[in-house]
Amino acid sequence: MASAVTLEMQSSRQSAAIGEVIAAGANAARRRWVPATSGNFSVRIDANHVAITRSGVDKGSLAPTDILIQPLDAPLLPRSSAEAPLHLALYRRDPAIGAIFHVHAPASSVLSRLVGKGTLRLEGWELQKAIAGITSHDEALAVPVFANDQDTDRLARLVEARLVEGAAGAHPAPGYLLAGHGLYAWGASAAEAARHLEALETLFEFELSYRRFTP
């Protein structure tokens, strides 16, 4: 009986994670953040598995069959996205991460090219308080920016090394940018990841507009 209950709970968590991935994809598609099948979304099921979108599917019309159940300690499953290693590395590094959402939105794609690589510092925006741990617009928010790289295993190692370093004198963002590519954002739950994604993308829009009117 105990075994049956455990299996039922595992199945319930898996179904919930799949539903959250589908909802995240639909929300991003409505905002036009994932054009032409771009982007990928994942939600942690348990300590060893995540639900993650497969390659080449429209994120606005995901079906349960478009979601892979990927073990964290196993090779990538067939039909996996080339960017799956970037998700898996973060889940392995930080057990507190419950969901990771990646979009190719205009603001993050353009602003990341302007920055190039290094760090984007955001300061003075009230919306920064939507990020977990930030309580004032006076706190600086540091978003790491990396050069885009088609070798995502190598890129995952670079990201991990940079995150270990932290952000001196600023609050580390729950996300990072790939130049000319887009944003990865995460949170302790799918709801928090969605809030962080929306907040960061909106902050990038603010920053782009502000830079147009300042030398």
Q: Which stretches of residues belong to each language-model region?
A:
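Glycine-rich flexible loops
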Residues: 2-215
